[in-house]
Regions:
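Glycine-rich, N-terminal phosphate-binding loop of Rossmann-like dinucleotide-binding domains
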Residues: 18, 133, 151, 160
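Beta1/beta-strand and adjacent pyrophosphate-binding region of the FAD-binding site
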Residues: 7-19
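Short hydrophobic core segments
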Residues: 16, 142-152
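Rossmann-like dinucleotide-binding core of oxidoreductases
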Residues: 158-220
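Conserved beta-strand-loop-beta-strand element in the redox core of flavoprotein oxidoreductases
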Residues: 120-141
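Core beta-strand elements of the Rossmann-like FAD/NAD(P) dinucleotide-binding domain
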Residues: 9-11, 136-146
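Conserved N-terminal/central alpha/beta ligand/cofactor-binding core
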Residues: 2, 28, 34-35, 40-125, ...
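N-terminal Rossmann-fold NAD(P) dinucleotide-binding loop
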Residues: 22
């Protein structure tokens, strides 16, 4: 069996996770002169805001309830770039805007289709992560002085041995208004963003065999 090709890389800053947080962190790091790597396990940037999920950025405007407000900083730059070339709000074009923003930074190395699966620590600090890049079939050993976990799931922290918790904390711990009275193991499920078009007439639909059928009572 032929083994994977192996490549060792060295950076000042290594950011794992190419969603909006990771992308903005990588751009900021590169602009400050640090040799930066952005490790993203998908073929596109943006995370939930990419064409793969299509959750548009609406934090500052509260989903357009406050249209006079706007995102700031690098996110604002990206949204202005998108407005300039993407009047149709096509999410595939938005993907290209984010990709170009990363490629514009000479200090930033973009590693797409690259999945981290191990981390090495020394004296309580991460020194190296091990990744597999699907598109090149390479095993990458990425060394860095600073690592940032922008995975959205704390994956880097987990591989580094950091303490973690899952589920919902009780209301008494942090006094969050919607927290349950007792702690539980419930977590957010899969996020499905549907897109519907009014065809103007009934359209037949046959649900697949694996679909779960919900009653009106369950939906109430």
């Amino acid at each position: 069996m032929i083994g994977f090709k192996e490549e060792t890389l060295h950076f000042d800053v290594v950011i794992v996770g190419g969603g909006m947080t990771g992308l903005c962190a990588a751009i900021a790091s590169a602009r400050h002169g640090a040799k930066t790597a952005l490790v993203q396990d998908r073929p596109v940037l943006g995370g939930n805001a990419s064409s793969e999920i299509r959750m548009h950025i609406c934090g500052a405007t509260a989903n357009m309830k406050k249209p006079e407000l706007s995102e700031g900083g690098i996110v604002h730059e990206l949204m202005l770039s998108n407005k300039r070339v993407n009047d149709s709000y096509n999410f595939s074009i938005w993907d290209a805007v984010l990709f170009q923003a990363a490629k514009n930074e000479k200090n930033l190395t973009l590693l797409l289709n690259t999945t981290m699966h191990a981390a090495t620590c020394q004296d309580g600090e991460i020194t190296c992560i091990e990744c597999y890049q699907m598109s090149t079939e390479k095993r990458l050993l990425i060394h860095g002085k600073i690592f940032a976990d922008c995975t959205g799931n704390g994956t880097l922290g987990y591989y580094a041995g950091a303490a973690f918790r899952a589920g919902s904390e009780p209301h008494s711990e942090f006094h969050e208004p919607h927290a349950p009275e007792k702690a539980n193991n419930e977590r957010m499920g899969n996020t499905i963003l549907m897109r519907a078009i009014n065809m103007g007439h009934p359209v037949p639909f046959t649900a697949p065999a694996f679909a779960k059928h919900l009653t009106e009572k369950q939906l109430a």
